[in-house]
Amino acid sequence: MKPNLQDYPKFYRWLTLPFSRKPHRVQVLQRTNRILTFVMPGIYGLVFCWLFFKKTSMGGIWPFIWIPASGFVLFSLFRHWVNVPRPYEKWEIQPLLEKNSSGHSFPSRHVFSATIISMCVCQLSLPFGMCSMLLSLLLALVRVLGGVHYPKDVLVAWGLGLAWGGLFWLV
């Protein structure tokens, strides 16, 4: 089936069909979302532990603070300004993830944050960074399957996280 976003409820039903047939998968999806939203900030904390144990100077630590922080602030301001409704607000769908907020769907801040954290890790260790990047992609998938973001929300957020993380190579 080719996705037709003009009929998002039909696309979402198709996307979540494996979950409607096996309800325990919904619990796995919800737990995965919860775990990843805790793991990614934990990974960011481990970045600073790594920098501390490597006795990195403040000048070396500073980019790991200002690049993610400035990106997060600018990203949040843009997101607030465009204020796109979430899929469950616009369409008659029942999301698999609980979300009580409205608007601010585009782009996904969870995915942007996870991606920029992964870019931090890439600066320290490419193999660990790639593992972290896979977690950010998994989070993107979970957010779409969960019905709290459109595919474009997470793809744009992931791309912006990669682009903003490119600042590491400029400093």
Which functions belong to the PLM regions below?
Residues 48, 70, 74, 78, ...:
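Alpha-helical membrane-inserting segments
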Residues 1-44, 59, 75-101:
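N-terminal transmembrane-helix/juxtamembrane module of multi-pass inner/ER membrane proteins
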Residues 53-56, 83-88, 147-152:
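Transmembrane helix-loop junctions in multipass membrane proteins, especially transporters and channels
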Residues 24, 49-56, 124, 171:
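Structural signal for the C-terminal ends of transmembrane alpha-helices
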Residues 65-79, 130-142:
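Small-polar-interrupted transmembrane alpha-helices in polytopic inner-membrane proteins
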Residues 27, 31, 57-61, 65, ...:
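Hydrophobic, aromatic-rich alpha-helical transmembrane segments
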Residues 45-74:
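Interfacial segments of alpha-helical transmembrane regions
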Residues 92-171:
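Membrane-embedded catalytic cores of phosphoryl/pyrophosphoryl-handling enzymes
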